[in-house]
């Protein structure tokens, strides 16, 4: 890789590092008690550093909203913590992402950061091949 290709790669990595750095804590919807299915939780909180994702879990007619540790985002851990035997859940890592629509749609969305992380190596490889 020539000096120009290395400079371009360094520039891309620098932009990526600045873009992905987040100095603020994650913000999630959080209600101390489960809300009725027909209602939304509108209270938000800044999560502590050890709780790195937002959780929404539907169990029966109640919906739980809170900060959650992403590594603990499994049926077993969530059902044990919430004392629920049947639930549908979703964990996410974007501010205020724990909304009922993610449970209703059942899909996982890619964030802009994820897309940038996936595209950057291809762009760097393409630019390094230019003479």
From Swiss-Prot:
Main location: membrane
GO molecular function, one term: complement binding
Removed propeptide positions: 106-131
InterPro entries: CD59 (IPR056949), LY6_UPA_recep-like (IPR016054), Snake_toxin-like_sf (IPR045860)
Post-translational modification: N- and O-glycosylated.
Compartment(s) of residence: Cell membrane; Secreted
Membrane topology (UniProt): Lipid-anchor; GPI-anchor
Pfam families associated with the record: CD59
Leader peptide range in chain numbering: 1-25
Keyword Calcium annotated: no
One Gene Ontology term, aspect cellular component: plasma membrane
SMART domains: LU (SM00134)
Domain UPAR/Ly6: 26-111
Disulfide bonds: 28-54, 31-41, 47-67, 73-91, 92-97
Record lipid sites (GPI-anchor amidated asparagine): 105
Keyword Lipoprotein in annotation: yes
Subunit structure: Interacts with T-cell surface antigen CD2.
Known function: Potent inhibitor of the complement membrane attack complex (MAC) action, which protects self-cells from damage during complement activation. Acts by binding to the beta-haipins of C8 (C8A and C8B) components of the assembling MAC, forming an intermolecular beta-sheet that prevents incorporation of the multiple copies of C9 required for complete formation of the osmolytic pore.
Protein name: CD59 glycoprotein
Organism: Saimiri sciureus (Common squirrel monkey)
Gene that this polypeptide is encoded by: CD59
């Amino acid at each position: 890789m020539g000096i120009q290709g290395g400079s371009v790669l360094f520039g891309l990595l620098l932009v990526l590092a600045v873009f992905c750095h987040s100095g603020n804590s994650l913000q999630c919807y959080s209600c101390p008690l489960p809300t009725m299915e027909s209602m939304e939780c509108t209270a938000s909180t800044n999560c502590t550093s050890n709780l790195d994702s937002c959780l929404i879990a539907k169990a029966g007619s109640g919906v739980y909203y809170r900060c959650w540790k992403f590594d603990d985002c499994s049926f077993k851990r969530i059902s044990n913590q919430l004392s629920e035997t049947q639930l549908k859940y979703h964990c996410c890592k974007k501010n205020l992402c724990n909304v009922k629509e993610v449970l209703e749609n059942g899909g996982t969305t890619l964030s802009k950061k994820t897309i940038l992380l996936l595209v950057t190596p291809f762009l760097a490889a393409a630019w390094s091949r230019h003479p």
